[in-house]
Amino acid sequence: MMSGGMRKKTIGALALATVMTSSLALAQALDFETYRTRVEPIFLKKRPGHARCVVCHEANNSAFRLQPKPPDGSTWTEEQSRKNFESVSHLVKPGDPLSSKLLKHPLAPDAGGDEFHGGGWQFVSQKDADWMAIAEWVRSAK
């Protein structure tokens, strides 16, 4: 019979393994190369009337945490992109853009988004080209 302490450690280890497995499965469902070439550049892009996504989301207090902005503003290294991909993956429900916080949070409420984005609504419509690029990446996940 297991002691109370041993039982707690075993349950904790199983919970951690479950989280790691589901995180890995999620990342595998999403395509990294498409993310890096079509989605990630949007986070560096200046949108009229808004800060770049990276300006707010390189902070430690954000659930959507990006690596610090590249000094020349061009792009992240592959290692940084993989870290960004891992962070972004947690905000995506593969195959379902409107259930994905990554797309719903910065979308204006009138367009189907939520009301709680401190940086304002980056997208006023689901027809925005950048919103559609991210949505297509999410939709194509298996």
Model-derived regions, located:
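Post-cleavage N-terminal segment of exported redox proteins
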Residues: 1-35, 135-142
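Aromatic- and Gly/Pro-enriched helix-to-coil junctions and flexible linker segments
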Residues: 27-142
